[in-house]
Amino acid sequence: MAFLMKSMISNQVKNLGFGGGSEENKEEGGASDPAAAQGMTREEYEEYQKQMIEEKMERDAAFTQKKAERACLRVHLREKYRLPKSEMDENQIQMAGDDVDLPEDLRKMVDEDQEEEEDKDSILGQIQNLQNMDLDTIKEKAQATFTEIKQTAEQKCSVM
């Protein structure tokens, strides 16, 4: 607010022609050198700027890598559950340089899930499932299904 008032008053004084603007030009001249404003020499300021740019690039690279890892996870889940692919995720992975893998923790979880699914899909897994099921329940289900089929056949065919 004070800056706004100062600039309005100094503009009015300049317009009157009293020459009040010459002091302001000297103040602005000192502020045009950012190194002096920061209290550093020119070399220190340039080094500081380089360091800031490098840090920003590192942060951007890490951010892009994280985004690509998340996109890779989404792609993996889409493949696993047979969902449609997303071009946005593919683009994020390509932007990261196609050198993106799942984080190690997630990779371990995925590998464990795959092993469990393979065990369930194998013949031994099916046999274990049969052992875990109650034989009486299986027998009742089979008899109910047979009775239902027999009744349906009797309704459709008068010979039976």
UniProtKB/Swiss-Prot annotation:
GO terms for cellular component: plasma membrane; SNARE complex; terminal bouton. GO terms for biological process: modulation of chemical synaptic transmission; regulation of neurotransmitter secretion; regulation of synaptic vesicle fusion to presynaptic active zone membrane; synaptic vesicle exocytosis; visual perception. Its main location: other. A lipid is attached at residue 157 (S-farnesyl cysteine). The modification Cysteine methyl ester is found at residue 157. GO terms for molecular function: SNARE binding; syntaxin binding. It is found in: Synapse; Cell membrane. Farnesylation mediates presynaptic targeting and is important for function in neurotransmitter release. Residues 158-160 form a propeptide. InterPro entries: Synaphin. Residues 41-51 have a biased composition (Basic and acidic residues). It comes from the Eukaryota. Residues 14-51 are annotated as: Disordered. Keywords: Cell membrane, Exocytosis, Lipoprotein, Membrane, Methylation, Neurotransmitter transport, Prenylation, Sensory transduction, Synapse, Transport, Vision. It is a lipid-anchor. Pfam families: Synaphin. Weakly binds to the SNARE core complex containing SNAP25, VAMP2 and STX1A. Complexin that regulates SNARE protein complex-mediated synaptic vesicle fusion. Required for the maintenance of synaptic ultrastructure in the adult retina. Positively regulates synaptic transmission through synaptic vesicle availability and exocytosis of neurotransmitters at photoreceptor ribbon synapses in the retina. Suppresses tonic photoreceptor activity and baseline 'noise' by suppression of Ca(2+) vesicle tonic release and the facilitation of evoked synchronous and asynchronous Ca(2+) vesicle release. Belongs to the complexin/synaphin family. PANTHER family: COMPLEXIN (PTHR16705), COMPLEXIN-4 (PTHR16705:SF7). This is Complexin-4.
